[in-house]
Amino acid sequence: MSLIEKGRKKSPWIYHLNTGSCNGCDIEIMALLGPKYDAERFGVKLAASPKHADIVLITGPVTTQCRERMINVLSQVPEPRVIVSVGSCPASGNVFKDSYCVDGPLEKWTKVDVSVVGCSPKPEAILKGILEAVEILNNCRGQENNV
């Protein structure tokens, strides 16, 4: 394993994508990146562009307005990538389920690797989901290197 591969293993880049949420989960994600929970101690960094992301956190029900944007953003994330569904909305629509503008669940449009449920989930639960995603990502990278 090269020095760069070792570094990448310990510093996953996360891209956050809101697909129409109430912002409850988004607030918890921002709290997670702040000094109280300090996700950076695990090497987690927030990516400004999906092109630099290893892990994508998706919040909110997939709305008809956000669907094409989400597909476009996900197409820019390099493989291997891990998709983390945050909150109950991406999985079920939650309170937005029967809305005329919801075109979910998220799994209808992309494979979800980790699901963090709750409305809204606590930062600790989101961090646990991210660490699970890091493990999945490292396993994928390990398989790539063995090919």
How would you name each of these model-derived features?
Residues 1-147:
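Iron-sulfur-associated redox domains of electron-transfer enzymes in respiratory
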